[in-house]
Each structure stands twice: as C-alpha cells, then as structure tokens.
C-alpha cells in the first residue's frame, strides 16, 4: 500500500511538474515576463507561456479560466475580484508618455502640460502652432501642420492609465470622455 501511494504521489508530482503556466494580458509587461519565463524554465523545468493580447483580453481569459493568470495595467475593482474569487498584486510598474514626431524637435524638447494634452486628444487643439502650444514653447518655431493623434484601438490598460491621467488634469475631458480601458476618442487614429 505504501509503495502504491508513493508511486501515485510521484506520478501526480511529475504530471503537475510537467504542466506549463499560462498567462495572457497587457502588452506592456511582455518583455519582462519573457525574461522571467526563460529564467523560471531554466531553474524549474516548467514553462511559462504568456500571450501579449492586451489588458481586456487578459481579463476575459482569466475570467473564463482559460489561463493560469491574467495581467492588466489597470486595477481590477474589489467587487470584480470578489465575484471571480481572484486576487491581484503589482508585478511591474511603468509609465505612459506621449510620443511626438515633429521636425526640429529632439526627444523631450517639446513642452506640453496635462490640460493642453487633453485638448490635443479632444481635438480642440489640432495644429502644432496653436497659441497654447506656442506659449509653452517660447523661442521655438512650431509648424502650421495638423496634429495626428494616435491611440490603441483595443481595450487596453495603457489606455485606462492615459485616460485616467487626462481625467485628473482636465474637467472637460472628464465630462466628455472619462476614463476607461476603451473610450470613444474624440480626435484620433486607431492602431
């Protein structure tokens, strides 16, 4: 009997040990998770397969129990965690910044405030030489060219973080658009 139990436990342990860990969600942490997965497999022999499909997709998959863990850049409410019998904890911390491609400006050289950024994303500031941008960049020559606003098209934790910030710095943004993983962008090009 003892030999049978030991054999059974060994078989279960080998089966459990052979199972890969699966995860899905936010694109932001993928490079870090890939490095961690490589180190974890080397140390334990257990694979970690992470699908970088966006925060909303990760939440859907963990809620549907098709993955071992989900990842999102946006916090999940306590109510939803309780409903799904889940826990959350921070794994990686990062920031979101606007990217500007404007001739004559080096990275970090263009000055812009949160409220003005909200106006750009709402479409009320639509040209680089808008007086509000000119006032923030004295001595710089801003072109009379349209601003093309680009954002993610899918549900995204990065979108949540960005719109959360714009909601904090602009009452008009808060009233018209608000915060969320997916919002109706007033001025945009989806990617």
For the regions a protein language model found, what residue spans apply to each?
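Positively charged n-region of N-terminal signal peptides that target proteins for export
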Residues: 1-4
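Hydrophobic h-region of N-terminal signal peptides that target proteins for export
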Residues: 6-18
């Amino acid at each position: 009997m003892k030999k049978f139990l030991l054999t059974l436990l060994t078989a279960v342990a080998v089966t459990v040990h052979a199972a890969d860990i699966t995860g899905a969600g936010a694109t932001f942490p993928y490079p870090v998770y890939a490095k961690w997965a490589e180190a974890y497999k080397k140390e334990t022999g257990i694979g970690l397969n992470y699908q970088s499909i966006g925060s909303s997709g990760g939440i859907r998959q963990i809620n549907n129990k098709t993955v071992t863990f989900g990842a999102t850049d946006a916090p999940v409410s306590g109510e939803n965690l309780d409903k799904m019998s889940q826990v959350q904890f921070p794994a990686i911390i990062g920031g979101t910044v606007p990217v500007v491609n404007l001739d004559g400006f080096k990275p970090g050289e263009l000055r812009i405030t949160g409220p003005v950024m909200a106006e750009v994303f709402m479409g009320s500031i639509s040209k680089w030489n808008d007086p509000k941008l000119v006032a923030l960049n004295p001595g710089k020559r801003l072109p009379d060219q349209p601003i093309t606003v680009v954002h993610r098209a899918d549900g995204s934790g990065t979108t949540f973080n960005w719109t959360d910030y714009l909601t904090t710095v602009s009452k008009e943004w808060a009233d018209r658009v608000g915060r969320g993983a997916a919002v109706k962008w007033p001025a945009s090009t989806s990617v």
